[in-house]
């Protein structure tokens, strides 16, 4: 998704359509990412991680080709939906595999590293996308995504299974998944601690998705940045996300990290609304966004790790719900942001998501089990 952000405005001209419809391609991709995780997560709990990952990558390559050859915006939007569906396999399985292999502090370090790597990828993606888009147009960006899918597919074929059959059988008995035909989703949703941290993760991630939806238009259309300039600035902001994610293990506890990040999100969101209202310059806007994304990284990564720790008995389903709720909510945000003045809607969504994150941190834990409860 990040890779073609710099060319969103130019895609509006290429397809001869509106900004809202081009943003709808972001929305459908996120909806696909959300829905697909609900499919690949439980399947991987039952059949292992390797085969579903291979299947997902084959689907991703095929649907990316569909995006390339789309002749109108509606074909592109539909292909983006299925591309997101396919790409969700890699997203959900990366968390599941980490949870299969690690626990406790080791899981925190590993998931923080994964988030940092994602941040580095986010740094590179818009910069590379801006360069490719400047010389080859938006379709060339999707050709590069297709090539990346082939590389990941090759890696999936060489990957060792992290959830062997004997472990799958033990997990199935422990969660009564087989004997009572209980949905693994119901099992994990009955763990209220898991639900709490999924909500914290989701609403904090909403701030990130708001920035993804609005930044190309604010930076390019309002502040006059070129696609290449936008790519560099966007990549610089992603550095904040990567560094902050990697810094998570330095906190005394995940709860401390969440409190720190949430307070920072609320304060900076208020400052951004004031800056928008007073007609701030570019560098004030950029500085506030940099700090805001750092706070989001700390909060969302800590929420992610904690939720997966509480849902490890059915890690595939837990990862699926985590991703589905997060990306499903994120898929609504571009539509909301495009419904009114982009500065007003961006500021409102920043503050709303930050406030909801803060509200979720106040959900009491004294009656909650410290371990995932099964039916």
Describe the function of each predicted region.
Residues 79-120:
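Cytoplasmic helix-loop-helix junction between adjacent transmembrane helices
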Residues 59-66, 74-82, 283-291:
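Paired small-residue
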Residues 306-342, 349-350:
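A late C-terminal transmembrane helix in Major Facilitator Superfamily
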Residues 16, 48, 69-75, 86, ...:
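Helix-breaking motifs and short loop linkers at transmembrane-helix boundaries and internal kinks
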Residues 162-197:
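Juxtamembrane intracellular "pre-TM" segments in multi-pass secondary transporters
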Residues 258-302:
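C-terminal transmembrane helical hairpin of 12-TM major facilitator-type secondary transporters
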